[in-house]
Amino acid sequence: MPRPRKTRTVRTDLAVHFYKPQGIPLRDLQSVTLSLDGLEALRLADVEGLEHAAGADSMGISRPTFSRLLTEARTTVATALVEGWAIHIDGGPVAQGPALDGSACPNRRQRRGPCARRGAAGALARQTGDEPPSSPTDNEKDD
């Protein structure tokens, strides 16, 4: 008997669950299902630009599992685009994680990933393009 799938943390809040070619009724289209964890892997790797290890850490899964999810999601989206199919986003063993509003590090363990060595200020700086405040140097302290 296989072991149960590990729950994956997803921080994507969906407003839309279907994508389809314009002008064709959904009932006339073939559709493919993109899992929520696959969509999250796409978001982390392709939108946020995270490396596989950081994306896996953010989702609470192993790096090989993240890579497998990403490959499956890219294949699903590419097939739907090339064939003109609808994409239904749903399912998967997921748990809704905290929103990425820049107030905290996206992964709770700040050892790896986007907050490595810089803490939450570093993550916010990368999102906004600003540098985090630096500590004063010894020369500035003497003034």
UniProtKB/Swiss-Prot annotation:
Q: Which Pfam families match?
A: DUF134
Q: List compositional bias (Low complexity) regions by residue number.
A: 116-126
Q: Which residues cross the membrane?
A: none
Taxonomic superkingdom: Bacteria
The segments labelled Disordered in the record are: 100-143
Q: PANTHER family, alphabetically?
A: PTHR37478, UPF0251 PROTEIN TK0562
**Similarity comment text for this entry:** Belongs to the UPF0251 family.
The entry's protein name is UPF0251 protein Rru_A1194
